[in-house]
Amino acid sequence: MVERDRGVLVVTLLASMLAFGQVATGQDWPQWRGPSRDGAVTAFDVPASWPAGLTEQWKVEVGSGYASPILIGDRIYQFARQGEDEVMLALDAGSGETLWRTAYNASFDMWAATRMHGPGPKSTPAYADGRLFTLGISGIVTAFDAETGLQIWQRPAGPVEP
């Protein structure tokens, strides 16, 4: 699958599921694999009958990368790459409208081991206390205000000790 299409596919699928009837009624999905990091949805109302298929409600180009979207209330947050920038997006879950977009330059040198997977980002944002946290492809940790998209701070992640 083309890397560009992966981000569009993920957001399109999430939008289709939301339009069908709230995948997790009243349950936010604030980080990778959900609230408990186990991939389990606990607040799901099983429909009396399943539709024959999903109907696309909206579609938006978010960029490339491997970050999963997160859902907080009626907002979808997506971390992606657009050109030489890493971008944090807030989308309206009902319409797909971009509520805000914050970008910063994140040029990336492709090594042989990373060339197949592209320049990222590869980590899903995390949400806590009104803030979004991202880890960019070049090891930069950034905090954003979830309401406005304002970049609060940005720092190198530091060395990883095995």
Where are these predicted regions, by residue range?
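Bacterial N-terminal signal peptides that target proteins for export
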Residues: 1-12
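Noncatalytic, solvent-exposed loop/strand surfaces
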Residues: 22-162
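Bacterial N-terminal signal peptides
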Residues: 10-21
